[in-house]
């Protein structure tokens, strides 16, 4: 079965070093098989691409490699 991830954009506040608003975006569900961090990174404007892991934890995903992403997914099974 193809693994899919929910994508978000998040505004990052450098002052308090926290992510604030979370919005599902145009990559709402992205297949791990078609993961393209460069495309995701280049399409962000001021918001950061984030991914929600099966555990519910959200992480920055822009520079994440496909291999690292698969490791994280397997870790949370």
Where are these regions (language model features)?
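Local sequence-structure signature of Cys/Sec-based thiol-disulfide redox active-site neighborhoods
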Residues: 1-26
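Thiol-based oxidoreductase modules, predominantly thioredoxin-like and allied folds used
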Residues: 6-9, 25-39, 44-47
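Intrinsic disorder/low-complexity segments
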Residues: 11, 48, 62-64
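Short alpha-helical
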Residues: 14-15, 35, 67
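Non-catalytic, surface beta->alpha helical segment in thiol-disulfide oxidoreductase systems
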Residues: 52-77
């Amino acid at each position: 079965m193809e693994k899919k991830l929910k994508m978000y954009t998040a505004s990052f506040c450098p002052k308090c070093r926290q992510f604030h608003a979370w919005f599902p975006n145009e990559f709402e569900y992205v297949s791990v098989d078609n993961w393209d961090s460069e495309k995701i990174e280049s399409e962000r404007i001021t918001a950061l691409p984030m991914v929600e892991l099966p555990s519910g934890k959200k992480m920055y995903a822009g520079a994440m490699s496909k291999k690292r992403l698969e490791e994280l997914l397997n870790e949370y099974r």
